[in-house]
Every structure is written in structure tokens, then in C-alpha cells.
Amino acid sequence: MSSWIRWHGPAMARLWGFCWLVVGFWRAAFACPTSCKCSASRIWCSDPSPGIVAFPRLEPNSVDPENITEIFIANQKRLEIINEDDVEAYVGLRNLTIVDSGLKFVAHKAFLKNSNLQHINFTRNKLTSLSRKHFRHLDLSELILVGNPFTCSCDIMWIKTLQEAKSSPDTQDLYCLNESSKNIPLANLQIPNCGLPSANLAAPNLTVEEGKSITLSCSVAGDPVPNMYWDVGNLVSKHMNETSHTQGSLRITNISSDDSGKQISCVAENLVGEDQDSVNLTVHFAPTITFLESPTSDHHWCIPFTVKGNPKPALQWFYNGAILNESKYICTKIHVTNHTEYHGCLQLDNPTHMNNGDYTLIAKNEYGKDEKQISAHFMGWPGIDDGANPNYPDVIYEDYGTAANDIGDTTNRSNEIPSTDVTDKTGREHLSVYAVVVIASVVGFCLLVMLFLLKLARHSKFGMKGPASVISNDDDSASPLHHISNGSNTPSSSEGGPDAVIIGMTKIPVIENPQYFGITNSQLKPDTFVQHIKRHNIVLKRELGEGAFGKVFLAECYNLCPEQDKILVAVKTLKDASDNARKDFHREAELLTNLQHEHIVKFYGVCVEGDPLIMVFEYMKHGDLNKFLRAHGPDAVLMAEGNPPTELTQSQMLHIAQQIAAGMVYLASQHFVHRDLATRNCLVGENLLVKIGDFGMSRDVYSTDYYRVGGHTMLPIRWMPPESIMYRKFTTESDVWSLGVVLWEIFTYGKQPWYQLSNNEVIECITQGRVLQRPRTCPQEVYELMLGCWQREPHMRKNIKGIHTLLQNLAKASPVYLDILG
């Protein structure tokens, strides 16, 4: 009986936990094929006994195959075939390795559903032939075929062509067996009547009016005789084609304006490869105003509109039927141009009741015109309730022309409404006088109070006392990921310092800007399971740095990954052991467990056995991106000891940028706002792999990048948009602004934004609409992307997915060589 009692409580809970853990490992092992090991994202089969005879497949209701990103197979002599349906379930697969095995045949459509494949390694197998049709839809960065007994034929000439196109020092040594069973280098292979095809598009003038029709003709040539097809993308207009072996035509009828700017290609394809000839379609059409809405208030009032038309329409605004003469106070701004579509707004600087009225937009070009009208109400009329009709006949007001408000025609008196009651007029005049006296009295009283407070402030050491310096917890975004315990994270006083940010006479309402993402409890997955790591499995090696929350160490962690006995990790310790600190610690661990992405630093788990509490992250060999950029820039010779590292190329910068953008796309999809995106908070691993993440050290190491406000608050103002500086508003759009600054950092090799200006000067520049200049090494397309990130109006900034797509396309156009890391 006494032994049963001893198993109650925590001991029994631990026993049940151990049993579930054993069952979990048993299920994972049972679901994995014999001779293989499986994890949530990887399958590896390297045991030759008993080995596998077919491509590994996961059992139903086990690990989701869509999450598998890597499959590694080695020493499987009985694996000979990859069938069409063997790989289709692994839609997230990025790396496929089959080496030292018996692979002889790959079905033509084996990789049809694996569009994410980037690396394929078929080294030392039994392949005698391999068609390019397997891979033509894939964007492969690596295809390794060394050690296969290829037969010399036209079927493998595409591999030779691919090798010649790469022309890099790491070109593979490939051979094939000729008719005499002699091994000859693939680079020397010559096959008669076996060459690349050619395509020639005889395009007429492809500038056509909407609703018209056009015919394109194309001829192809080559030996082997190529197949010909048309690539029309997502063409909206009705089209039909006629093709023979070497000739073809494409008829497009009733051409739609939606097809303007689209590319049409004629493609010739044979065994060796493909060629294409393309033209761009330009459609001229009359303007249409597709969007005109009531004014919205941000930093300025804006009447938003969208206009389509080609050629570009001329825009003219009318106010209450009269031409609106634009000025610096009222002007048309085009924020985004998408070929034939223009998104913008009529911007009004501090409009009053005098600007209320009907606004008409007219757009016209040589093909026609369109107009739309919107009623705008900015402010209530003096002496009238805000919802009353300003055109009430007893109200007297004067016409306002261009000289006063830059609106309308100075000769137009149509806005005047004559008085119909002299007595009412006199009464209202008396009422106006009383109103002015009351307002003047209130203003005078406020000035006296302000002077009194300023006098008191002079006698205070810091100019600000008590509650005014307390950090607000009613932020419009969620609470910070990193621990904040009653302001104890910083050694400074709780009183506001003399360096508090001042704009004009108003102190900016700011809050603690966390190092990482904001999150609410509702965003955490209910089944979040944080991995717990035994303290004896963590062996500290050396200190990497110290942040506000504790020290960060390089360590070895044992029994963390099944394929490795030990791995290098970075561990973050928590020096504050208070109850609040521990709650925030566990909350952060749950958040990090939910964030799983190739460009977010991997979180392995926690160690809570004793103090200090520890978080375990993957270790990134080359440290933070800012230091890496500086070490591989033109000024590296000033900092390096001995031979300086190789300078980063433009293509490598694009490779870095698109990885960071990919991480930000993921965070946006998870509804997280980073709020401190900068190169100092990105880490660099091997092969130029970049991930978003930090360990709470950046505010100590990069203290000049932050601006202390009121003693507690540290703001990265050089990376912040106007709405974040002035209104403490952090959104995905504010992250987009920061991403634009990160691009600027990358192309300046890690320079500090606005390095020539003080913090107050930076605030003034950003709030006045100035932007960073184009770096010397930055392509124009990338700088235009930066400008798209730095639009003053948040809703006008580029979409994060669009940014990633553009950077990805630019990176693909520039091949990246990763030997910079040695």
C-alpha cells in the first residue's frame, strides 16, 4: 500500500509522460520503412541490410509527407526504379539524394508535383540514360550525376549543354560509354544531327487597340526535329493556334486591355534542349476609373483612386464643378504604377470645412475619357452640428479661390449663398464673438498651465517624473516575445531622460519596442509541445555575448538529433528568475516552437532543470549579417587581419535579400510583426544561408542603432516608418518599411542608415518624407523596390509576397557562387 502511495502525484505524471514518449518513438519508427530513419522533415535510408527495394513511402496517419523537405538514400543496391507516383506525396521536397545505389530508371513524370525541388544528387548509380523532360519544369540549382554509366547518345546531349551553360569551376566530370564500350568525357561528345533547336517569331507591330485582332507567325528548326508550342501565360483574350512540325500561327481575337504588357512566346523543344522567341503585347484603350472612395486620414487626407488606361491618361480634378488648381497643399500623387494601372490619391494637407464638397476626377487620353465624383466631408462647419447641411440658406460664407486655398476658379462665385434674414445674421455674429472670446480664454488658460509645468520641469533632474515615464502596456499590437519585467531589463532610471524624443512641442508617445515578434495567447497553437532538454546534455564551450536578458553561449548538445551524436548550438540563459520572467520564458518558448521555417533560426527547446533557465537555438557559423556584410565589403581591409575576405557580389547580395524576404513572408502568413528587422538581427550560416533571429544581444552590441526614450524605451528609429515613430503603430506594413532599409544595408555592405545624421535629425528626415539614397552597388530595380517599401502611406507600400517574388526573380537571373565562405 505504501509503495502505491509513493507513485501518486508528480512521480506518476512523469511515468505517464515517459510512456507516451516511448509510444511516440514507437509510432514514428513503425511508420518508417525498414532500413530507414524518419523525422518530421527528413527521411534517410543508409543501412544496406536488409535494404529497400522501392522508393520509401510513409505509412498513413504517420508523419505528414508534405512536411518532408529532404530524402537521403545511400547503399541501396536493390533500389532500381523511381515510379511516377513514388515522389508525388512529398510536395515540399527540396533535396533528393540517391547515391551508391542501383538506380537505373526514372519515370518521365516522377517529379511532376515536386516544384520545390532544388537539389538532386544521383551520384554513382546505374543510369544509362536520363531525359531532360524529368527536370524542365523544375528550378534546380544543383543536379549531380557523377559516376553513372551513361550511353553516348543524343538523349544525354542536354546534360553536356547544361554543363557548358554553367561554365563554373565546379563542373562535373561526366563520362559515357560509346559503341566500343570506351569511356569518353561527356564534354568531348559529338553526336551528328543532334543540336539545340531555334525559334523565330515573325512579329508584326504588337501595339494594338482594345477589341481588335492580331495573328502571330512562328517557325522552328533543328535536328532532331523540334516540337513547337505557344506559351501565352495567363492570356485573357480568346486565342487559337495552328501548328505543324516547323510552322505555326497564333490568332488572338477581341483583345482585352487586361492583356497589355503580357509576354507571348514561341517555343521549340527537342531532346537536346529548347529555344524560344518572345514579344510583348501592348494594348491601347480608353481610360476607366475603377476605384474612387471617400477621403481617408493618415498623415495627410487622401481621396484614393485607381485609373486604368493606355496611353497614360491625363488626370484633372474638379471641385464643386470648377477646375481645381493644384498646389503643394492639394495635389495628385501616384503611388503605384502597374503598367496600365495607376494607384494614387488626391492629397490634401490639413483640409478644413472650407474643403468640404464634391470632387470629380476626369481621366482622358486619345481613345476616350471617364469621370467619377465623390462627396468629401473633412470637418464640421462653425456654428453648425457636424452632421448638419452646410448649404443651409441662413448660413453666410465667402467663396474661396485659388489665392486662399488653391481650389477652384477665382472668378467663380457660384459657391456664395446670400443671406435671407438680416436679424439672424446679426445674432450669429454676436454668437461668433462669444465663441471667439471663450476659445481665447481656454487657450490662454492652457498656456498658463503649460508654462507652470515647464517651470516645474526645470527643477527636476530629468525633466519628467513618475507615471509619465512608465511604459504603456496597452499597445495596439501584442505583448513582446522577449521578457520585460517591470522595466528591469535596462539599468537606467525609470525617469525620462533629457534625450527623450521631442518633435515640435510634443513628446512622442512610444512604448518598449521588443526585439522580436508580438504575439497573443490566442495565436499559440493549443497543442504546442516544447521540447525539454536535459542539462547534462548541454556542454558550454564559450561565451558569445550578453544581452539584457542574460548571457549567450556556444555549446555542444548531445542526443538532440538522431543522425548526430552531438551538434553545436547557441544557448540563451535567463538571468532574472522572477515568476513573471519564468512565465514570459515559457510563453516565448511556445511561440518559438510554433515558428518553423528554413529562414527563421531553428529553436530546439528549453532546459528548466535548476537555474538559470536555458533556451537552445541552432548555431549559425558566421554570426550576425551586419558583421558579415562589413567583413565582406570594400572596407574589410581596414578591419581584417591578414588577407581580407572576398568582397560580396551583387548576385550574392540578392541571394541574401530574397532569403530574408522569404522569412518575412512566413512571419506575415503567421500574423506576426517583427518590429525590429535589421541585418544585426539576421544570422549567417554555411553556404550563405541567412535566417531571421536574434538572442537579445543586439541592443548591447549595436547600442548606437537604438535611441533611448524616457529611460526605458529603446527604438530602432533608423529602421522605422513615420507611423511607428509618431504613433507607435507596428504592422506588417511597418515591417515592409524595415525590409526596405535592410535591403539598403545589404547593398551598402552593412552601413548604418542615415549614418551622417543624429537621431533627432533622422526623425525629422523620416517624418518629413525623405528617403535613403540609392547605394552605389544597388541595381535600379532593387532601389525601386526600396522606394516601394518606403511609401509614406502604409497601404501604398509593396506587398511582402510581391517583394519576395521580385527578389527571387532577380536572384535567379544572377547565378550565385557560394565559395565566399570558404
From Swiss-Prot:
Q: Which organism is the protein's source?
A: Homo sapiens (Human)
On this chain, the residues bearing Phosphotyrosine are: 516, 702, 706-707, 817
Name of this chain's protein: BDNF/NT-3 growth factors receptor
Quick check: keyword Transmembrane in the entry?
Answer: yes
Instruction: Please write the reaction equations for the catalytic activity of this protein.
Output: L-tyrosyl-[protein] + ATP = O-phospho-L-tyrosyl-[protein] + ADP + H(+)
Signal peptide positions are: 1-31
A single cellular component GO annotation? perinuclear region of cytoplasm
Q: Where are the transmembrane segments?
A: 431-454
